Amino acid sequence: MNRLQQRQLFLENLLVGVNSTFHQMQKLSINTCCRSLQRILDHLILHQTIHSPAFRLDRMQLRQMQMLACLWIHQHNHDHQVILDAIKWISP
């Protein structure tokens, strides 16, 4: 598998993780959802260390992707408090 394929696989795994977490939202609170996303991202950060640094996403990029996922969840829930909670949870 070449580097471009590895990066594509990494991004697909991230999207699958975010998507599966979103579909559990009916049963989970936003904080639980965000924690699940963080576990997925942390796992992928560890996993991607086998890739060339030139093709890695750094932690900031992954957190930006997590933020986008939370915004997406917010849009699907139409709940202003959800996004405020998500931003507060994600912020260092």
Swiss-Prot record:
Pfam families: Rota_NS6. It comes from Rotavirus A (strain RVA/Human/Indonesia/69M/1980/G8P4[10]) (RV-A). This is Non-structural protein 6. Keywords: Host cytoplasm, Host mitochondrion. The keyword Coiled coil does not apply. Interacts with NSP2 and NSP5. It is found in: Host cytoplasm; Host mitochondrion. InterPro entries: Rotavirus_NSP6 (IPR006950). The keyword Protein transport does not apply. It comes from the Viruses. Belongs to the rotavirus A NSP6 family. GO terms for cellular component: host cell mitochondrion. HAMAP family: ROTA_NSP6 (MF_04093). Its main location: host cell.
